[in-house]
């Protein structure tokens, strides 16, 4: 057993998990439960009353956090200590949304001035493009942005841009390319005019396979459509640490934005990686996005554990994963603009906490990161919600909804909200056999049929959920929401004693992919790998089954 599972608090939680009353009973015996188990911070309200949790549960979870030195670990992250121990890096995405007055030290120097300098450079660039001052090679203004990246440099900008659609500059369109599948970029290029298109290449090394391949294809298309190599600088900019490679490609050094080792890809949308966002919504709104995240940073760093929104959400998720064998967690967004958030949180959580050894290399003997999945309401209610209500797996849920819509048409939002709240209620209370039977009392079914159908209509309830509300989806509330999930992820990793900031599984996939690519291009069939890989590679070389 690890020190974590040997601890008295862990053992107490294990014993306590077998004795928590049904949520129906918890609500029936405490009319003030919502008031006791909800809190507001940074423009968000969290209702966590619909959880399998009592005051004793929370006390034990907070004790587990304290015993795991969570507060010290939070301070270490914000202070720029080397908490990504396997890569010997600080973890300071929070510095990207700090105020200019702050001082944050990394590798012996204050990094805030460089962050502010980059924001100011972004401001100038955004102003140049959106004002029409930036011209393409035929002196036409830019109308289309193509953001080329992968992982965090793709998903963050795409999802945030999608979420903030009401704030877009109507004169600009943005297209996102990530997958190395040629179909992805080909379909985008069909829509574009090379004279008015600007490409943003985001890669720390300027050598990430997918990103470089797509960028080279974009340049080939640009040159084939009439542009010259000397025109590339008017249509390509980069976010990278490798200035030499970018300038060799044809990008002007003045149009290269920095990346830093202390920012992981999945936490990078707040940096110059967010340039597509800034172009679409303007720098004032981009700064509001940063401000909302900064407010959540301050809350996370300073609120006591018992009143700390990311801490509470992280602990409750851990509670179900480690003591109720919940192996997945569903995120349900009741706002069409937020439909991409489940995929973003999936990457954030699963890439961070999909680990199986502790910081000192000991194999864990407890579950770590769950599968994160989800979608938008009310679509999911006519699909996978069935499994949430009557399936055999326990799947905790997060419901996210703005109280006000950007598109208040008729009763649409009233119906959306009623479905959202109704789902949380149904998951919590379920339906007993007697209730199901009573509903069938006036039907034409026989007594035997009523008994049978009632059995099928029973729902156990006691299915946990959180509800997150905001007045309206704005850059600020979105920033706070994303930072909330970042810190929630940190909380779990800190208690599990794993490194939430490396991704060696991703690196292995890259290495083996490069090896296979070389074998595909070899002059002879492959026979050096396992039988399955050999066969698949050789079938691909033949081009037919």
From Swiss-Prot:
It catalyses: alpha-D-glucose 6-phosphate = beta-D-fructose 6-phosphate. Its main location: cytoplasm. Pathway: Carbohydrate biosynthesis; gluconeogenesis; Carbohydrate degradation; glycolysis; D-glyceraldehyde 3-phosphate and glycerone phosphate from D-glucose: step 2/4. GO terms for biological process: gluconeogenesis; glucose 6-phosphate metabolic process; glycolytic process. Its EC number is 5.3.1.9. The active site is at residues 351, 382, 510. It is found in: Cytoplasm. Keywords: Cytoplasm, Gluconeogenesis, Glycolysis, Isomerase. GO terms for cellular component: cytosol. It holds the Pfam family PGI. It comes from the Bacteria. GO terms for molecular function: carbohydrate derivative binding; glucose-6-phosphate isomerase activity; monosaccharide binding. PROSITE patterns: P_GLUCOSE_ISOMERASE_1, P_GLUCOSE_ISOMERASE_2, P_GLUCOSE_ISOMERASE_3. Coiled coil: none annotated. SUPFAM superfamilies: SIS domain. Belongs to the GPI family. HAMAP family: G6P_isomerase. Catalyzes the reversible isomerization of glucose-6-phosphate to fructose-6-phosphate. This is Glucose-6-phosphate isomerase. The lineage of its organism: Bacteria, Pseudomonadati, Pseudomonadota, Gammaproteobacteria, Alteromonadales. The gene is pgi.
């Amino acid at each position: 057993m690890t020190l974590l599972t040997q601890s008295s608090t862990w053992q107490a939680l294990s014993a306590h998990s077998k004795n928590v009353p049904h949520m129906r009973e918890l609500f029936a015996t405490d009319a003030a439960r919502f008031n006791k188990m909800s809190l507001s911070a940074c423009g968000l309200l969290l209702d966590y009353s619909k959880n399998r949790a009592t005051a004793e549960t929370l006390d034990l979870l907070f004790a587990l956090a304290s015993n795991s030195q969570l507060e010290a670990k939070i301070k270490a992250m914000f202070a720029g200590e080397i908490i990504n121990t396997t890569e010997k890096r600080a973890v300071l995405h929070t510095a990207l949304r700090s105020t200019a007055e702050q001082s944050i030290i990394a590798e012996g120097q204050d990094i805030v001035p460089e962050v502010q300098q980059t924001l100011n450079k972004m401001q100038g660039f955004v102003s140049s493009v959106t004002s029409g001052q930036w011209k393409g090679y035929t002196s036409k203004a830019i109308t289309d942005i193509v953001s080329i990246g992968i992982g965090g440099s793709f998903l963050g900008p795409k999802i945030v841009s999608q979420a903030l659609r009401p704030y877009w500059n109507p004169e600009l369109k943005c297209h996102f390319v990530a997958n190395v599948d040629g179909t992805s970029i080909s379909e985008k290029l069909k829509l574009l005019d090379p004279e008015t298109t600007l490409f943003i290449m985001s890669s720390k090394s300027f050598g990430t396979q997918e990103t470089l391949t797509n960028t080279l294809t974009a340049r080939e298309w640009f040159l084939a459509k009439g542009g010259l190599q000397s025109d590339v600088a008017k249509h390509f900019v980069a976010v990278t640490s490798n200035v030499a490679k970018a300038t060799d490609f044809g990008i002007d050094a003045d149009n290269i934005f920095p990346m830093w080792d202390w920012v992981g890809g999945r936490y990078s949308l707040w940096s110059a990686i967010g340039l597509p966002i800034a172009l679409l919504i303007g720098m004032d709104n981009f700064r509001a996005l940063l401000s909302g995240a900064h407010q959540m940073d301050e809350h996370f760093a300073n609120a006591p554990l018992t009143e700390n929104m990311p801490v509470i959400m992280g602990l409750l998720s851990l509670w179900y994963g480690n003591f109720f064998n919940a192996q997945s967690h569903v995120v349900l967004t009741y706002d069409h603009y937020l439909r991409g958030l489940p995929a973003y949180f999936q990457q954030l959580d699963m890439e961070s906490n999909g680990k199986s050894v502790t910081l000192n290399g000991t194999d864990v003997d407890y579950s770590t990161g769950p599968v994160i999945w989800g979608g938008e309401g009310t679509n999911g209610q006519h699909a996978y919600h069935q499994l949430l209500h009557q399936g055999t797996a326990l799947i905790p849920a997060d419901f996210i909804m703005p109280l006000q819509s950007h598109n208040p048409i008729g009763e649409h939002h009233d119906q959306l909200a009623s479905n959202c709240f109704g789902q949380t209620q149904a998951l919590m209370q379920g339906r007993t056999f007697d209730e199901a039977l009573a509903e069938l009392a006036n039907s034409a079914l026989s007594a035997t049929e009523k008994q049978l159908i009632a059995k099928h209509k029973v729902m156990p309830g006691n299915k946990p959920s959180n509800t997150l509300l905001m007045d309206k989806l704005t850059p600020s509330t979105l920033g706070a929401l994303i930072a909330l999930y970042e810190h929630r992820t940190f909380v779990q990793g800190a208690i599990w004693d794993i490194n939430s900031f490396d991704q060696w599984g991703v690196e292995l996939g890259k290495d083996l992919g490069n090896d296979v690519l070389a074998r595909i291009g070899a002059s002879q069939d492959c026979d050096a790998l396992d039988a399955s890989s050999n066969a698949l590679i050789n079938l691909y070389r033949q081009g037919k089954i």
